[in-house]
Each structure stands twice: as C-alpha cells, then as structure tokens.
Amino acid sequence: MTVDVTETISQTVHPAFQLLRQHHVEALDILVSEYKHKVTGAVHYHLATDYDENVFLVAFRTQPMDSKGTAHILEHTALCGSEKFPVRDPFFLMIRRSLNTFMNAFTAADWTAYPFATQNKKDFQNLLSVYLDAAFAANLNPLDFAQEGIRIELENGQPVYKGVVFNEMKGAMSAPSDQLYHQLAHHLFPETTYHYNSGGDPKDIPDLTYEQLVDFYKVHYHPSNAVFMTFGNQTAYELQEQFEKLALHKFSAGTTLYSKPEKRLAAPIEVTENYGVDSDDLKDKTYHVLSWLLPEANDIKLRLGMRLVEGILLENSASPLRHYLETCGYAQSTGPLMGVDDSNFEMTFYCGVQGSNPEHAQSFRDGVLNILRDVAAKPIDSNLVDAILHQIELHQREINGDGTPYGLSLILNGLSGAIHHNDPIQIWDVDSAIAQVKEELKDPMWLSNLIQTHLLDNPHRVQMTLVPDPTKSVKEQEAEKARLAAIGEKLTDADKAEIIAKTKALEERQDTPDNLELLPKVGLEDVPADLHIVQGQLREIICNRMDTPLNLYHAGTNGIYYQQVLIQIPEDIVKSPYFNLLSILMGEVGAGEYGYLELQNLQTAVSGGLGMGASLRSKVDDKDKISAWLTLTTKSLTQKFDAIHLLKLAFEQLRFDEKERIIELLQQRKTRWQSRLSGSGHSYAMQIASRNMSALAQRDYQNTGLGALNWLGELVTKITQDDAAYDELIAELKRIHSKLLQAPKQFLLVCEEHQSERLVEEIQNVWDKLNVDTATTELTQVEQANDNNHEAWLIQANVQFCASAYQAVEVSHPDAAPLMVLAAYLRNGFLHSAIREKGGAYGGGASYDGNACSFRFFSYRDPRLAETFKDFEASVQWLLNTEQQPHQLEEAILGLVASMDKPGSPAGEAITACYALLHARTPAFRRTLRERLLHVTLDDLKRVARQYLVEQTPVKAVVAPFAKRDELQQLGFTIQQVN
C-alpha cells in the first residue's frame, strides 16, 4: 500500500529533502520511502527494516558513446584519493580498516555504482564519509589514471601499454561469451550507449585521454544525475543529514541524463562475426543467437508479462523453446544469452545455442520461429502459467544474502528502474504487478499475443552467427604491436624522456607511504566479543525403519522452507570422477513413472528446484582424510509439501534409461564448462599448485580440475560413438547410486517455527521407507596423480593466472590462525602494490586453505609471468627483513574477523551452521579459531613465514594463453592444455 505524505511524516524528513511517497512492501516487510533533494534533485530511496546490516549505494547515470572504457576507468580512478582523503588508495585501505560485509564498485552498461554494507554503525559512518568524498570530490590524479587505466612505458627502449583496466578487459574479452554479448549489442543497438562496451575494448582503451576522463566526471558525477539507495535500521533522516553535510551542500542544480529510445530496425538483420580460438579444429565451436529489442522497461505489467513468456518458453527442459534448443541435433548446448534482459532502458529477449557450426544458421532461425508460432497460435496451458507465477512468488519472497548482502540484492534489483527514471517500487512489490497480470490472464490469449507482438511481428530482430577464428588473437596482437611500433618510430628523445619521467613519477607515487591518519578506522576494540552461531535442534525420525537424525532450525524465511537430505559419502565414491556426473543427472532425468519432461514441469510447479551436490572438507586434524556429505536439496513455499515427495522420488527412483537425455546433459556440461574457464583461471592455478597437499586437494584436482574437463570431453565422445562405453558408464553410475541409497543419512529442515511440526511430520511420512538394493558393489578404481611438477595449463585467454603453493597444516593446528593472518598481511602490505599497481594485474594476493592444507600465492588477469613469481617470494623477504608496523597486523586481523562474522540469510546461516557440525567444525572449534586470530602477533607471522615458506620449495602453476607455451617451457613448467 502507498502511504499519503502527511504533515506528521514530513516533520521527520531532513529539511534538505522532500518526501515524495512511502510504500509498505508486505511480502518483504520493508517500508520504502522515496525522497528528492530540494536543490540538486538527487533521488534517495530508503528501504527501512529491522536488519542491522545497513547498506549504502550511490549510482550515477553514465552513458559513454565509445568503447574507450571511460566509465570503467573513472570508477577505478575515483577511488584513488579525494578532497578530504588525499591518500593514494583509500578504497583498498578502507577494506583493511573496516568491518565491512561488502565493499565494491560496479560499472554497468549505463550506470556506475558505489555500494558498501556493514553491521557496525561507526564503520558505516567511516565508509560513508570516504565513499561520498570519492564520488563527489575525487582528485583524479593523472598518475592514478595512468596506473588504473592506460599508459605507455618503455621496455628495452620500445613502447608498451600498461594499466589495470587495460589488462582486466583483455582478460574479460578473451571469454567467448563476452565477445558474443558485446558484438551482438553492437548490432542490436545501432545508436545508443548500449552500442558500446562501457568496460572498454582493449583496442580502444589506448585512445582515452586524461582530459576526456575529467570531462566525463564533471558531466556524470553530479548529484542531479545521482540515485542514492539505503537499506537497514538507520533512519532516512540521519542518513540524509550525512549526505547533506558530507557532499550535497556544495552543489547547485545540474544536468540530469535521460536514456534515449533506440532507433528501430525496419526489418530483421543477419550478421556473422568471429571470436578468437587457439586451435585449427573449428568443428562444433559456433554460436547462434537470436535477439529482439522490446519496449521500454517502465511498463511493469508488460515487464512481468515478458517474464512469464520467458518462463513459458525457457524455464526448464520441458519448456518448448528450451526443449527445441537442447534437442535440435545441430548444437551441444543452449547459449549463454537466454531470456529477458530488463536491466537496460529498453528490454531485450535472447535465445541461442553453442557448440554448433555456421551452416546451421538457417535451421536455427527457422526452428526457433516455428516454435514461437506454435506457442503463439493457441492459449497457454493455465497450469504452466501458474507454475511460472509460483516461481516468481518464490523468488520474490526468498531472503538471499549468502553471497551479496540481502539489502544490496534488493537495491540492485530496483536500481535499473531508478536509473531510467522509472518506478523501482513496482519491482520490489511484485505482488501488485501480479494482480494486474492476473487480470490480463483472464484473456487466455494474452501471453500468446505478447509472443506474437513482441517476438514474431517485431522487425527489430538480430540474428548473429559467431564463428571461431584461429587467426583473430594473433591479428589483434599484431595490430597492437604495429600500433606501438608506429608510436615508437615517432618518439623523439624528448618524448622518451617524458615517458621515462612519468614512469618514474608513478613509481615514486606507488612507493610513497600513505598518511593513514587521514582515514577513519575501526579497531579490534570494535570487534564483537563473540561469534554469532545459529543454534538448531536435533530430532530423531524414522528413515528406512531406522532412527535418523533431523537437524531442525527455526528462522525467519518469509514463508519458505528448505529441506535437505544429507548422506555420508563412502570414500570410494568421493574419489570417483563419475560421482560428479550423477549429480548432473538428478532432477534433470526422469524418476519413477515420470519421464524427464514431466519431472521438469513438476519441479517448476511445486518447488524451487531439486539439486544434488557435495559438501567436502578436509578432516580438521588429518589432511589425508576427507569429510564428505552428499546433499539433496529443495525449497518451496510452506503450503507446498509436494517438494518433499518429489525430492525423494527424484533420488530414490532416478532413471538411467533416457540415453539421449543423459548424453545431452553431459554434452551441455562439457560445453558450458569450456566457455567459463577464463573467469576462474586463478582458482584453477591454485588448485593445480596445491594438488598433492591434502587428500581433498588431490581429489578436487582429479575430479574438478582442467584435466577433468578433458576427461569429460573424451567420455562424451566415447559414449556417443560406442554403445558399450555408454553401457559401462551407466553401470558405474548405478553402482554409485546403489551405494548412496545404502549410506547413512541425516535430514536438514529450515523453516519458520509455526510450520516446523507439520513439515517434520511430512518428512517422517515420506522418508519412512526407502527402496534400497543391499547388494555389495565395487566401483571402478581411478589412478590418482601424485607428481609435484611445476604445471602450466594452456586455455583460450589473453592474460595469465599464476600461483605458488606451500604445504601447510590442518585447520585445527595452532599455526592455522597465523597462516591466515600472514596471507592477509602479505596481500595488504606488499602483494597488492607489487602485482596490481606496479605489475598491472587485475588482482593478486595470498591465502591459507584449510581444505588443501596449503598456503597459496596467486595473481588474476596478469600480464606478467616470471616477475610475478619473484614478487611472491619477495613478499616474504619484505616481511622478514623490513620494519613492520602494528597497524598492518590489526588491519589483517580485522579483515579476517569481519569475513568470519559476516551475516548470511536466515536460511543460509542455519545451513552453514549445520554443515559446520557435519564436518566437526563445532561452535567451540569456530570460536577457538576466531580467538586465535585475534591474538596473532608479528612474531607469529615471522615464525610461520620462516617455517612454512622459507624452508620449503613451492609448487608453481600457471593458467595461460597458448601463445605462452615456449616461454613457459623455458621457465621449467610441464605443459598441459585444455582440448
């Protein structure tokens, strides 16, 4: 409901602001208030709740009209010092001086945002002062632009490009999915800002000048062009008082930017573009995609209607369009662009496939359009519509917050509406929009007509075929070399002297210690005395005629329950690569009397999905043993008990007779895995380096590493061509399934207290009897790798990911805490500057991993190789041989404790608490570890550095482009490659 703005309410409004309206969103139990700053017109949305994790975000409408990366580089440079805080790196310094639960900055296609979250009020005030000054009074030092954006340096007398964003975007644009998105947008949006890459195209970034950056800041970073959003238990008045005092009072009215509608195509177009691959084998590497430009996103009824259309067409494998794309025969998987994108000014709709060939472009287009015609020709089944509405309600009600803070998730959901001068309250309060849609659904052809109007009859349609090109990467590298050579030929001695002087000035700036007294901070005295751990109840129910533990947690879940079955995994299953394949199948193949298409629709109608996964940890006191639990998961609205029945059915009666479907699922897994490698290169590098340092590390390298991707590709080829190989696979999966049915079980239930007894009773009734094959089974043994070579893996990428690993101790060992602090200390004090600021990598650092029982250094999207490994070792010598400051130790500890204390969603905290108990991470264990962290000393850091790092030889690993093969061989790496 919307609340009238009364005189009583207005008395609580800060005098610099005008209250426009208030609206209570019942489904979320939040009061949304919209305000306008009287002088500048800045908009403020406050989401009032009783949560003590308060969230702040300020966003600007940024609309670049080129691909130089102006908005992205400005996002970085604005955080490099401001009027009140003239230190070189306030953003990363505040991460260390804070108890934040989230700090970041984002550059989207047409907005830039600066969010943070914290549970500590003093910390909130500190971060708010730094963020507001960075946003509205950034210094924009030319040397920071050179560091973060783009610069030329001389190496052996020849010019080279350097810059953090330059290397970041080289890494980002090596991913085929990123190339697909940006090349498609180039055609779908011929004239507006979406035509360009706001993050920056590496070939265009060198064209950006410092003066252009400053001009962009002056136009876009003004309160009149800003949206403020806040969430939590602080009042809007006290927040606005700070906005006014710290920033807004200095401004008069400025320009507000508005988005422009795209010029519409008169007829559909077809285009072919290419992307780089490092192989001459081009078979099955083409992407096909169809995209439509839809109306503006401001019509909430149409927006929700198109979401329903997306659900009808694409929700699951039984949905007609997804089913066609998955079974068409000319592609290996659906593509990365699928469904409605309503985050821009005008909505878009995508569908596509990957793992195809260029000659199938017409078949793809004709097949998609035929499906759309079939669906649009008749009324949509009302049961399917109800199932999609159920998914929308479930998504609306669910309280997330286990990755991104819950309040920030809500804010980001509504931000696009506010940025485009639309109404974000309509997005938060979807119940009222659903009521409008239900009125429209009384016309049985309403959704069918939306398909006809906005897809079939819409001339603004782009079909793109993205084909692999083994020469593209080489051509891009040669073009960059030629450009730099041309620059070098024109350089006079005076030009070279100027470049050298600027390089020296940047190095001096990077080496000059910041005056940390200029920045606010929290200290260890502000850390909560105790670790908050959710407490549950241990019940007993009967499962398969045996007493079975049920872990019950009461939580404010907003009308949703979460049910899991927890199965202790036998050791031979843990190490089997086939186990991961079984988890791909559950919920995706049929079960019992239901084929997979029927089961897909059932899941959509009664649950938030069915899942099978694994929770794996090293034993707390023995690195050679694994604590392993299979997790069967579902969630649903509390009135829908059918999800409990469906979870048991899908696991107990999982079918292995749908051969085409099983091959299809494994093929999809392989194709999607291949397309996502470059975003996780640092994780793979650390996994490779530490692969033999614990039993779990070895298992993960063997079963989830890059070698496992090659193994899966070979397996898919075998079972596609050889019936006997397929039969062997199914026999192995059946053996694993049989063992899991026999294995000991527990249950986990998270729900609201008043619903718990009914749900416990239902779980008892459903799981009372279990069909178990008690025959003993032996699994196929797989040979485990055990060498400690320095290993390099070659993938499709333009930058490197480096890692070094040292054998460390189990997490229960007293040295685990100082090793954790050591990692943060080296990152803060040395590695960030050496690897990111000076080396030009997008990121780098160190970590102690209690599961791999290793201490690991890493870099991310790194232009260097050998120099980075030298920096890893130099960081240890820096610690041991230079004077260290106590404040650096406090900062390292603060960050670790903040991470440990970070809240999750109500359900997420309960699930985390239960899993911790399963793996012997008891409350006493967790509190002891936290207490040890708080008491680590500098002497402890030096001791463990000598013991674990100086006295060992590290195992090194690199994930790198194919072009680095020769250099890596010269450095002594054993070369592997992703096929």
Spans of features found by a protein language model:
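Non-catalytic terminal extensions that flank enzyme cores
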Residues: T2-V55
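His/Glu-based metal-binding/catalytic segments typifying zinc-dependent metallopeptidases
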Residues: L47-D50, L57-A59, F166, K170, ...
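M16 family metallopeptidases and their MPP-like homologs
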Residues: E53-Q63, D89-A137, D144-I152, D178-K203, ...
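Active-site His/Glu-centered metal-binding helix of metallohydrolases
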Residues: T70, L74-A78, L582
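Hydrophobic, small-residue-rich alpha-helical packing segments that form membrane-like cores
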Residues: I152-N225, M229-A247, F251-V277, L282-D284, ...
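Non-catalytic, conformational "gating/processing" segments within enzyme and secreted inhibitor domains
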Residues: V214-L246, L729-I763, T953-P954
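In a subset of proteins, long, contiguous C-terminal domains/tails are tracked
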Residues: L934-N979
